[in-house]
Amino acid sequence: LKVKGNQLYQYPVEEMNKTKRLLEEKAEKINGLVTLHQPDENAYELEILLPENQQGILYLLANKERTRYLKVDFDSERGFVEVDRTNVGIGKMNETKSTRQSKFLPNKELKMNIFVDTSSVEIFFNDGLKVLSSLAFPEKEDTFIFLKMKESHVSTRLFKIE
C-alpha cells in the first residue's frame, strides 16, 4: 500500500515482478470481437491500456465458444467498471455476489493489470487506485482472452507468472 496525493494505492509486492516473464506484447486497432491472447494456462498477468472515452467488454477465463467466461465491462467515458463471474468455469457461479463494481475518474484512459491463477482474479485499475478481486474456478481449457470494442487502439502485454 502506498499513499500518493491523498489517494491510497494498492499493488502486488515487488517480488511478483521477479517471477514473471513477457510472453507477448501487442498494439492493435480493435473493431468488434477479437481474441487478444490464449495463454497455455491460467497463471498470468495481463496489462491492458485502453484509451479515454471507450466502452467495451473483456472476457477472461473463457472457452473458445464464450459460453464460460469472467466478464469485465468497462466504460472509461463514464468512469465505471463491472466484473461479473456468473458464467465462469466449473459449476457456474450462481451467487448473489457474482458481480463487483467500481468507479474511477471519467474521460481518462484506463489501465488494467490483471493477475489470474487457477482460483482467483485480481484487477488493479490505474496502477492500483482501485482493485477488484474475485474467486473463479475455470475449466483447465478456459484460457482464451477476448476483447469486444468499437474502433479503438489497444495496447496489451501478457506475462507468464512462474
Model region roles, listed by residue range:
Residues 2-162:
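Beta-rich accessory regions
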